């Protein structure tokens, strides 16, 4: 069984929540919950409110996502 394709979105972190979770406003205006990927945790990349990020989301649940990249300015 093949793994489903993930959908990528760009957005901006609007709020930092407890337990390494974030509220992200997407470029199209929707707000979603997101968590940082294992690579970001392993390399200790900090994500703050106002950072631009790239999210991966499942096409089946577009309310949650995984942050896989923090843009530099």
Curated annotation (Swiss-Prot):
One of its GO terms (molecular function) is translation initiation factor activity. It is found in: Cytoplasm. One of its GO terms (cellular component) is cytosol. Keywords: Cytoplasm, Initiation factor, Protein biosynthesis, RNA-binding, rRNA-binding. SUPFAM superfamilies: Nucleic acid-binding proteins. The keyword Metal-binding does not apply. It comes from the Bacteria. It holds the Pfam family eIF-1a. Residues 1-72 form the S1-like domain. The keyword Nuclease does not apply. Coiled coil: none annotated. One of the essential components for the initiation of protein synthesis. Stabilizes the binding of IF-2 and IF-3 on the 30S subunit to which N-formylmethionyl-tRNA(fMet) subsequently binds. Helps modulate mRNA selection, yielding the 30S pre-initiation complex (PIC). Upon addition of the 50S ribosomal subunit IF-1, IF-2 and IF-3 are released leaving the mature 70S translation initiation complex. Component of the 30S ribosomal translation pre-initiation complex which assembles on the 30S ribosome in the order IF-2 and IF-3, IF-1 and N-formylmethionyl-tRNA(fMet); mRNA recruitment can occur at any time during PIC assembly. Belongs to the IF-1 family. This is Translation initiation factor IF-1 2. It comes from Cupriavidus pinatubonensis (strain JMP 134 / LMG 1197).
